[in-house]
C-alpha cells in the first residue's frame, strides 16, 4: 500500500538524522476500524478499479478543509489512546483519512500537537486538507500552486518530492548491457491491461530483455512464467530499486511514489492509460517535465511506441537529464529543518 510505503521511507529519513529517535508506523484504517479494515481496503480497491468515474467524482466534490467526520466522539477517544500509547511529539500523515481525522482531533481537543501531511501524488484533492494541518510536504511546484488556490497559506507548503526509501537514492553505476532492459510493473496486484499481448510483441524483439514484477498476484506469476519462459517474472519483492536501476525504461501506472522512485533511479517512464484523478495529475507532471511518455488513449499502439522510444537514445538521455534536474530542485533537508525547529 502506497501510504505505508511512504511512511516507511519517512521513517528511514528521520532515523538517518538521529538513530535514537523512535518512529512508529500506524495503519490508521486498521487502528480505527480493526474489525472492518480488510473490508474497507477491499471496497476501496473495487471502487478505484471498477467504478473509477465515481471515485473521481467523489474526490472532485469533497469540501475544502471539511473536518466533519462520523463517529466523532469514538474517534477522538481512539486518537487520545493512540497518542498516549506512543508518547507522541508530532504526527506525520501519508493518507488523507489520517490528515482529516487528526485535524478534527486537534480542533476538538484544542491540541497543539504538530500535524505534518505528506501528499503522495502531484494532484492534491480536497480530502488531504485539514484546518489544523501545520505543514504540507508536496512533490512539486504544481502541487504547491494547487494548494494555494485551495486556500492553504504559502508558508505552510514545502516542496520536497514524494518520499521514497533510501535504497532508491543510492543510485550506483550499472555495468554495461548488451540489450535494452524494460521493467513492467502493475502495482501490488501486478495489474497491467493487455499484459499478454504486450509481452508477446515486445518479447519478439531480440534487443530487449523483459522483467515483469507481478507483486502478490500469484495467478499472474504462474501464468506468465509458463507462457513466456524467456521473460524474467518476479513476484513480491523488496528489491524494486535494483530492478529500476538496471532498467532503461519502466512500463507502469502513474503512481506518485513510483514516479519519484523512477526519478531517483534515473529511469524513464512509459505510462499506461491514466484515468484516476491522481494518476492523470501524475501523468501530466511526467509529460510536462519530459521524464516519460504517456499512453493516453487505447487507440495508440503500446508495443510500437515502446520499441520506438527504447531505440531513441537521445530522447532517453534527455528524460534522464530532466530527472536529474528534478532531484536537484528538491529540498533534501525539508524534514530535518521542520523537526528541529
Region roles according to the model:
Residues 288-290, 298-314:
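C-terminal "capping" alpha-helix adjacent to the active site of nucleotide-linked donor transferases
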Residues 328-341:
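C-terminal alpha-helical cap of glycosyltransferases
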Residues 9-86:
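Conserved N-terminal ligand/cofactor-binding loop architecture of enzyme catalytic domains
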Residues 245-255:
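Acidic donor-binding loop of glycosyltransferase active sites
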Residues 107-159, 164-167:
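Active-site-proximal region of nucleotide-activated glycan assembly enzymes
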Residues 308, 315-329:
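A short, well-ordered alpha-helix in the C-terminal region of glycosyltransferases
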Residues 154, 167-184:
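Nucleotide-sugar donor-binding and catalytic loop/hinge architecture
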Residues 177-246:
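Donor-nucleotide binding loops and adjacent catalytic segments primarily
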Amino acid at each position: 500500500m502506497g501510504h505505508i510505503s511512504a511512511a516507511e521511507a519517512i521513517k528511514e529519513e528521520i532515523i538517518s538524522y538521529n538513530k535514537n529517535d523512535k518512529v512508529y508506523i500506524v495503519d490508521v484504517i486498521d487502528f480505527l476500524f480493526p474489525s472492518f479494515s480488510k473490508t474497507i481496503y477491499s471496497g476501496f480497491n473495487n471502487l478505484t478499479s471498477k467504478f473509477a468515474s465515481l471515485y473521481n467524482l467523489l474526490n472532485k466534490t469533497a469540501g475544502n478543509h471539511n473536518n466533519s467526520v462520523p463517529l466523532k466522539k469514538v474517534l477522538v477517544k481512539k486518537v487520545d489512546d493512540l497518542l498516549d500509547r506512543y508518547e507522541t511529539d508530532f504526527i506525520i500523515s501519508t493518507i488523507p483519512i489520517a490528515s482529516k481525522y487528526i485535524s478534527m482531533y486537534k480542533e476538538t481537543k484544542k491540541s497543539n500537537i504538530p500535524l505534518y501531511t505528506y501528499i503522495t501524488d502531484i494532484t492534491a484533492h480536497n480530502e488531504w486538507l485539514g484546518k489544523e494541518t501545520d505543514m504540507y510536504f508536496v512533490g512539486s511546484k504544481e502541487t504547491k500552486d494547487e494548494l494555494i488556490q485551495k486556500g492553504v497559506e504559502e508558508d505552510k507548503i514545502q516542496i520536497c518530492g514524494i518520499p521514497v526509501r533510501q535504497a532508491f537514492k543510492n543510485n550506483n553505476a550499472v555495468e554495461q548491457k548488451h540489450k535494452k532492459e524494460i521493467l513492467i510493473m502493475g502495482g501490488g496486484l501486478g495489474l497491467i491491461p493487455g499484459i499478454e499481448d504486450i509481452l508477446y510483441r515486445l518479447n519478439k524483439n531480440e534487443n530487449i530483455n523483459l522483467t515483469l514484477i507481478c507483486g502478490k498476484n500469484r495467478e499472474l506469476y504462474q501464468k506468465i512464467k509458463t507462457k513466456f519462459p524467456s521473460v524474467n517474472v518476479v513476484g513480491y519483492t523488496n528489491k524494486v530499486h535494483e530492478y529500476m536501476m538496471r532498467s532503461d525504461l519502466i512500463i507502469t501506472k502513474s503512481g506518485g511514489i513510483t514516479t519519484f522512485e523512477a526519478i531517483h533511479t534515473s529511469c524513464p517512464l512509459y505510462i499506461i492509460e491514466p484515468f484516476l484523478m491522481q494518476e492523470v495529475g501524475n501523468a501530466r507532471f511526467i509529460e510536462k517535465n519530459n521524464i516519460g511518455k504517456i499512453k493516453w488513449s487505447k487507440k495508440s499502439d503500446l508495443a510500437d511506441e515502446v520499441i520506438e522510444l527504447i531505440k531513441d537514445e537521445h530522447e532517453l538521455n534527455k528524460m534522464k537529464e530532466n530527472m536529474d534536474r528534478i532531484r536537484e530542485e528538491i529540498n533534501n533537508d525539508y524534514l530535518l529543518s521542520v523537526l528541529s525547529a
